[in-house]
Curated annotation (Swiss-Prot):
Protein name as annotated: Nucleoid-associated protein PMM0020
Cell compartments where the protein resides: Cytoplasm, Nucleoid
Subunit-level organization: Homodimer.
Disordered: annotated segments: 87-116
InterPro entries (alphabetical): YbaB-like_sf, YbaB/EbfC
Alphabetic keyword roster: Cytoplasm, DNA-binding
Gene Ontology CC terms: bacterial nucleoid; cytosol
Length: 116
């Protein structure tokens, strides 16, 4: 520590370099997540959904044999597929953020860094 409780200039410079590096890598990660397609499907594979790494819905595929299912079963399958895609997307995003920050606990909103 330098005088007056301030870190020395070298430490401060390194901290700024690290922050800039994280910022640049965060933009790359954002672009990567945006271009990802993560699939979720119902257990019977009648419904498949894809969402981006940013958790935006991309598309839905319905098996042509679904017409034999009743309304409640179809609704259950849709919800199941969405939940699985969302869970995979969330896990992927957390893993990539953890890689980006080198395990630093940044307490970013929406990302519980202690889940990993």
């Amino acid at each position: 520590m330098a005088g007056f409780g301030l870190p020395n200039f070298g430490q401060l410079t390194e901290a700024f370099k690290k922050a800039k590096e994280i910022q640049q890598n965060a933009q790359k990660l954002q672009d990567e997540l945006e271009s990802m397609e993560i699939e979720g499907k119902s257990d019977d594979e009648m419904i498949k959904v894809w969402i981006s790494g940013n958790q935006l819905p991309l598309r839905v595929e319905v098996n042509e044999n679904i017409s034999t299912a009743n309304k409640e079963e179809i609704e259950k399958n849709i919800l199941e597929a969405i939940k699985k895609a969302h869970e995979s997307s969330t896990t992927t995003m957390k893993e990539r953020m953890n890689d980006l920050t080198g395990g630093l606990n940044l307490n970013l909103p929406g990302l519980d860094n202690n889940d990993s």
